[in-house]
Amino acid sequence: MANILKKIYDNDRRELKKFEKLATKVESLADEYEKLSDEQLQAKTPEFRKRLEKGETLDDLLPEAFATAREGAKRVLGLYPFRVQIIGGIALHYGNIAEMMTGEGKTLTATLPVYLNALTGKGVHVVTVNEYLSSRDESEMGQLYKWLGLTVGLNLNSMSADEKRDAYNCDVTYSTNSELGFDYLRDNMVVYKDQMVQRPLNYAIIDEVDSILIDEARTPLIISGQAEQANSEYIRADRFVKTLTEDKSDDDADDDEDHGDYKIDWPTKTINLTNQGIKKACEHFGLKNLYDIDNQVLVHHIDQALRANYIMLKDIDYVVQNGEVMIVDSFTGRVMEGRRYSDGLHQAIEAKEGVKIQEESKTQATITYQNFFRMYKKLAGMTGTAKTEEEEFREIYNMEVITIPTNRPIARKDLPDILYPTLDSKFEAVVKEIKERHAKGQPVLVGTVAIESSERLSKMLDQAGIPHAVLNAKNHAKEAEIIMNAGQRGAVTIATNMAGRGTDIKLGPGVKELGGLAVIGTERHESRRIDNQLRGRSGRQGDPGVTRFYLSLEDDLMKRFGGDRVKLFLDRISDNDDDKVIESRMITKQVESAQKRVEGNNYDTRKQTLQYDDVMRTQREIIYGERMQVISEEKTLKPVLMPMIKRTIDHQVDMYTQGDKKDWRNDQLRDFISSAITDEETTKKLNIKHLGAEELKKRLYKIAEDNYAEKEKQLADPEQMLEFEKVVILRVVDERWTDHIDAMDQLRQSISLRGYGQLNPLVEYQEAGYRMFEEMISDIEFDATRLFMKAQIRQNISR
């Protein structure tokens, strides 16, 4: 372990040395660039762009580009980046995390690599945790980029697609992490390419990177729509299906007539309407062609109603309890609480059983921040606290954490923790401490882990007659204003962890002499990083300050880890209950070792989430890639559709013609041909009993090719034909993909139950997920075949 730590430390120093050399080069250009006129300095941007076109790299341009942005900042913003900010900027350019203490000017630091990377014209995203910070930084730092001839955009949730597209087409775009992720998902749901708003993801600098890539790493971004099926549709389909009779005739029967409306293939648990059943459906619903494009949703309802009524068995596959349909686990025979069948099957069973049909929202697209940000060509981040999570950043995001030296030495005093036996005694001591510091005018910032603690403390301060402000991370703009004033003489501010993050606390007049900002932590967070963030609120840019944590044996962390050992220690050193207070480095060490354990557990959980999510990531990339090919195609999709149709024919014919000819399932084969490939009359003429499997395939290929040619003739305009092909593929892919997301989610919830014996749940999930993906692809090809072959051409086709 010691060797690993030494290796990391040496690497850190090596990188810093390299960056220091580059920073010296940037500084050496300062005098020369200071002498340039505004016009000459502004002319550097087109000059750099030309040099990039001629083959120079961003690394080649770094010293000059940084010197340009630095001099520009002095003229436009009245701010001149220090040497340490240049080093931070270099770390960011090379795709690292720059750990910079609070107040060291992270926002200004980012302008240097943003300017350099924006010269490529491929787009730089500056990512913040909320829209207040995005708007603030865009309006302040944006002045510099515009002055240097770059375009700057702000991407907000309230914007239209056109406004978003304009923002993304700028050289520099400010946005929140959530809006970037949602725009990516929405772009992969559009039906026309020109509806997309984002360009390929090039370079991002994430502010408060630990908050986004660690604290929110497991939060999935989800776009969901109300499942479009109205409950009445399930009931209509159910009523129709209940009128049907089963065709139980043997496959070897000599006649080609149907002996019922649907046929079940029990080995594969599939059920299909016979030609007789298809005719009945057309009569019942008043349709000419059941399998026309416009009837796709109805066909889906009928399919699910058939499965619900004739394949899913009550008290075997499911039970009805208290008016609800509950799934039974086929392995254990136990009812699975809270689980539902996907793809509308659960609602179809509810319709069958006459219980209340529950509406479901359907996930149409989802991604985690971990996987979204790993798609950028280059990623960098800034924060005051990242070193404790260094291993995670390296392993998951391939980013090194570089600790940037402070511009001035840190003068803040971090006092040892104080421990009390109860919450009451702890909070009384906190109020006493605030009272004493407030009396002499020293500003106090009190950090709490939970909103309840904030409210409890606020009441106690009211009773003590101490004016104060409370922040609970709800109103970002108002919070920023309160936090800015938290360093004024006599200010008392209570804040939960995240409140006001991203805004500096500057000391008011005369506060330095009073000892600077006093920070009081009322509890240790389970992550050392969050505690360090609170400490870092004080002592910015070499200011004086003091920090201390007040703990009690009733705090969550103390109860979970090491509370008993500390209690014994407390009992030994103090006889008098009221005086059981210890101020000791031992307590601090005990707490930190507990925090390390929690951090380790949390990291393992996030790592596991990523391993599971990687299965979906691979599948999502395949589907989104194929989808992009479809919407980008400008000539014909025949090379995509015809192989789909042929693979479907191969798969279905092979499935029903296994073994000797006497074992062939001719009825199911006929049903497939007449429902998905051609009409009933042509199916009869094929006389499939007298054909071999390969000969049958050839004849079906010919029917498909003729059908294609006929449609091309009917739609003489190639653009109309292309539009028709796109309609077929996109409708099927989108419907099947959203069903698959749902099914994968169900699988993930159930897979943990299978983690018994020697089975590894992750391997189980990967294998089952792969099988389900293969099945989905097969379903897409089958549906596209049926939709294309059976659709009746109309001129007014639209997606």
From Swiss-Prot:
EC number: 7.4.2.8
UniProt KW keywords: ATP-binding, Cell membrane, Cytoplasm, Membrane, Nucleotide-binding, Protein transport, Translocase, Translocation, Transport
GO CC annotation terms, alphabetical: cell envelope Sec protein transport complex; cytosol; plasma membrane
Principal location: membrane
Compartment(s) where it occurs, according to its Swiss-Prot or TrEMBL record: Cell membrane; Cytoplasm
Quaternary structure note: Monomer and homodimer. Part of the essential Sec protein translocation apparatus which comprises SecA, SecYEG and auxiliary proteins SecDF. Other proteins may also be involved.
Name of the protein in question: Protein translocase subunit SecA
Lineage per the UniProt record: Bacteria, Bacillati, Bacillota, Bacilli, Lactobacillales
Gene: secA
